[in-house]
Amino acid sequence: MTYNLKKYIRTDLEDFAGYSACKAPELVKTSKLIIKLDANENLYGAAPTVRQAMAEFNQYHIYPDATQSEIRRLLSEYTGVAVEQIVCGAGSDQLIDLLLRLFINPGDEVINCPPTFAMYKFYTELNRGKIVNVPRDASYNINIAAINNAITPQTKLIFIAAPNNPTGTAISKEEIRQILDLGVPTVVDEAYYEFTGQTMVSDMSKYPNLMILRTFSKWAGLAGLRVGYGLFPPIIADYLSRIKDPYSVNIAADAAIRQTMLQREYMLETVKKIVNERQRLYTELSKFGWLKPYPSVANFILCKLLKGKAKEVQHELESKGILVRCFDAPMMENCLRFSVGKPEDTDGLLKALGEMGE
């Protein structure tokens, strides 16, 4: 007799699509050197002291600090936010999940502004919430009036990526304040803060509904160690700390973050290099008649293909050892996203694109 395990699975997850992550470099079938431009990582890598600390680390047999006390102290110095308002997690993804677990009852609504970071929708639906999409305009700007019209008594959260991923679009502090003035708990995702220098931290005392997320994956070269943090009103930080699994920031990540914060000026210099390279990449991409690059304030550039198929271009680049992200969702049909790497990475990408356009 066949045992039917499926009947025990949550019915709302039967058709859950899951998340399509970037392909791991070791899975790419090519003999060429990989240029990885698909996940918005810092290709300069971690600070030298981080690499040294990881090479010398010998405490893997010990559980990490469950409260991340030293990391939070260093982050308090960095952000100017009190230690008790800071919560660390396994990437900002975990904090998104925890926020939704904390706020959402089945059927509660979350306002989302697509195209945007896919994990807002992913975790909302995983936690039995209802996504209410308020699409951006043709330039990928947020429609604040439409957000206001979408609010109902069931609205529990609004997610705003500042700047937006995957479009790179900026949003002004005044626009964010207009959203906060609507009175709904609002999560401002500042994953790319170090590339813009714009933050809502100074507004936290004025807006008790403001929550800020950040990550070490983009600017600090630590994507593989999965560390993010959030800045929250004290009551929310307390609740999140209660429901968060205690050892979510592993001991190697803990050590790496400590070194990163001590060497942050070094890492911020690499950020400056990436910002400069972003402008060069945008200028050069604009010269291809078949590509339309969108302005970006992050560490990537989104391009729409004016002719040809994005998926085919992605595959052709992969065959040359260059990994990029392809999008074909509503409002992002036939688009590619290029992370900004080192100058030699840009050179390799431009050379490959030039050969394809010949």
Curated annotation (Swiss-Prot):
InterPro entries, alphabetized: Aminotransferase_I/II_large, HisP_aminotrans, PyrdxlP-dep_Trfase, PyrdxlP-dep_Trfase_major, PyrdxlP-dep_Trfase_small
Pfam families referenced in this protein's UniProt entry, alphabetically: Aminotran_1_2
Keywords (A to Z) from UniProt: Amino-acid biosynthesis, Aminotransferase, Histidine biosynthesis, Pyridoxal phosphate, Transferase
Calcium in keyword set: no
Catalytic activity: L-histidinol phosphate + 2-oxoglutarate = 3-(imidazol-4-yl)-2-oxopropyl phosphate + L-glutamate
Cofactors: pyridoxal 5'-phosphate
Top-level class of the enzyme under EC nomenclature: transferase
Pathway(s) per entry: Amino-acid biosynthesis; L-histidine biosynthesis; L-histidine from 5-phospho-alpha-D-ribose 1-diphosphate: step 7/9
GO molecular function term, any single one: histidinol-phosphate transaminase activity
Biological processes per GO annotation: L-histidine biosynthetic process
TM region(s), chain numbering: none
Record bears the keyword Acyltransferase: no
Gene3D superfamilies named among the record's database cross-references: Aspartate Aminotransferase, domain 1 (3.90.1150.10), Type I PLP-dependent aspartate aminotransferase-like (Major domain) (3.40.640.10)
NCBIfam families found in the cross-reference section: hisC (TIGR01141)
Stated family: Belongs to the class-II pyridoxal-phosphate-dependent aminotransferase family. Histidinol-phosphate aminotransferase subfamily.
Subunit structure: Homodimer.
Record's protein name: Histidinol-phosphate aminotransferase
Biological source species: Dehalococcoides mccartyi (strain CBDB1)
